[in-house]
Amino acid sequence: MNLIIWPTYLDSRKSRSEGRRVPLEYAVESPTASEILRAARKLQLEASMESDRAYPPSWWESSGRVVVEYNGKKSELLPKIARLVRSSRKR
């Protein structure tokens, strides 16, 4: 199953009502679609980036999105990806 992951889902500057889907302890400031793509590939998932897309509630910000082939729940995958993005920034 293909899951779409928008950078907003992992953004610590966004509230839950604005689209963040992970707890603040996992969220990062201004994540990019390319960081999410690298994290998904690190988890050995089939993933592709669509850089010309914008998150519908904030259509004026062209943030891009990542499409991931994953058979589990999105709510299980997002914290894993967020942790990898966060740890890659600490290096």
Curated annotation (Swiss-Prot):
One of its GO terms (cellular component) is signal recognition particle. Involved in targeting and insertion of nascent membrane proteins into the cytoplasmic membrane. Binds directly to 7S RNA and mediates binding of the 54 kDa subunit of the SRP. GO terms for molecular function: 7S RNA binding. This is Signal recognition particle 19 kDa protein. InterPro entries: Signal_recog_particle_SRP19 (IPR002778), SRP19-like_sf (IPR036521), SRP19_arc-type (IPR022938). It is found in: Cytoplasm. The keyword Cytoplasm applies. Transmembrane segments: none annotated. It holds the Pfam family SRP19. Keywords: Cytoplasm, Ribonucleoprotein, RNA-binding, Signal recognition particle. It comes from Methanothermobacter thermautotrophicus (strain ATCC 29096 / DSM 1053 / JCM 10044 / NBRC 100330 / Delta H). Belongs to the SRP19 family. GO terms for biological process: SRP-dependent cotranslational protein targeting to membrane, signal sequence recognition. Part of the signal recognition particle protein translocation system, which is composed of SRP and FtsY. Archaeal SRP consists of a 7S RNA molecule of 300 nucleotides and two protein subunits: SRP54 and SRP19.
